[in-house]
């Protein structure tokens, strides 16, 4: 847990920490954000999912006021001019960058000072953060001597040191090994429990499935789905895998018409009436049930159905490249 960070009092704005309506942003002939509506509830963990090039980074930068939309409007912590709220926001950009000669604790304090935190207090908090996360040995090390993952952790701490009400993270898990990814997930949950709103982008679906209360699936600059992960999964029917000793008989008429048969097993969507009526007919028809499993769809399955197989393959490829790096 980050030291000296009390739970936040209720914010003086509406129920949404971030809102965007009808947002459009083009670069020449390329429309990176194409008519997006988004609302991030206060205190929530909200994930923007999509492959590289989907428009995630441009959307975050537009919401933060780093770039202005060509059309539409946005509010950040209740203010229609987002940059005025910069001191209450922690932002980790996709492009990482720290001064290589600066010591780790100084880099964190410096980023806090840019957000209005007194330098002496920033140094105190920086040392406490590093020590509290088992990185006390890195306090006085220059950035150039740190591993890539440790340097990224330092930049993340610089995003958090001034106790922002809103944290925006662009691909925060990129470049981290599995252990540091788990630590980052724990840190995100910790901040959310303190009342901080977390908005992050990712092309790794598993992180969103574990962390997010709400998600937006983005492809081609548009939001293809917005809601809870459960709502995304509920768009798909559960799948049944059945194996029988008998290969034929009157009982087969009870199987759904779209059943796929393969080597004595049957694969079909869970019937609307549930599995019990079908089981009765199979038992009475002496099908000889050897095994039966019901597979609930995951968020990856929902992503494929919503954004398309090409977008899912691009997401998977990017994740595999990171794992191999």
What are these regions (language model features)?
Residues 230-234:
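Short acidic-hydrophobic catalytic motif
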Residues 103, 118, 228, 271-274, ...:
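Short loop/turn segments at beta->alpha junctions
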Residues 1-24, 309-325:
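ABC-family P-loop ATPase nucleotide-binding domain
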Residues 15-20, 25-219, 225:
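ABC transporter nucleotide-binding domains
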Residues 238-310:
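Short, charged/small-residue-rich alpha-helical element at the C-terminal edge
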Residues 87, 236-238:
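A generic structural signal for short beta-strands and their flanking turns/coil linkers
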């Amino acid at each position: 847990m980050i030291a000296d960070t009390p739970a936040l009092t209720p914010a003086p704005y509406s129920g949404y920490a971030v809102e965007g309506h009808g947002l459009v942003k083009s670069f020449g002939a390329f429309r990176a954000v194409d008519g997006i509506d988004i609302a991030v509830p206060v205190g929530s963990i909200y994930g923007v999912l999509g492959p590289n090039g989907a428009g995630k980074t441009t959307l975050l930068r537009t919401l933060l006021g780093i770039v202005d939309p060509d059309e539409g409007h946005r509010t950040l912590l209740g203010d229609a001019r987002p940059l005025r709220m910069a001191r209450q926001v922690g932002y980790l950009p996709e492009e990482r960058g720290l001064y290589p000669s600066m010591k780790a604790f100084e880099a964190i304090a410096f980023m806090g000072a840019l957000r209005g935190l007194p330098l002496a207090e920033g140094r105190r908090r920086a040392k406490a953060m590093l020590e509290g996360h088992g990185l006390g040995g890195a306090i006085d090390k220059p950035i150039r001597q740190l591993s890539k993952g440790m340097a990224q952790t330092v930049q993340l701490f610089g995003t958090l040191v001034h106790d922002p009400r809103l944290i925006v993270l662009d691909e925060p898990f990129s470049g981290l090994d599995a252990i540091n990814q788990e630590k980052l997930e724990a840190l995100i949950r910790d901040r959310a429990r303190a009342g901080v709103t977390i908005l992050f982008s990712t092309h790794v679906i598993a992180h969103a499935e574990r962390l997010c209360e709400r998600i937006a699936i983005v492809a081609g600059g548009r939001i293809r789905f917005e809601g809870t992960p459960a709502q995304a999964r509920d768009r798909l029917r559960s799948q049944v895998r059945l194996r029988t000793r008998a290969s034929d008989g009157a009982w087969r008429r009870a199987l759904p018409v779209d059943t796929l048969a393969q080597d004595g097993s049957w694969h079909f969507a869970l019937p609307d009436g549930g599995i019990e009526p079908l089981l009765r007919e199979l038992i009475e028809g002496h099908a000889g049930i050897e095994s039966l499993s019901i597979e609930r769809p995951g968020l990856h399955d929902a992503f494929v159905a919503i954004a398309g197989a090409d977008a899912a393959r691009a997401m998977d490829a990017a994740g595999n490249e990171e794992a191999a790096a």
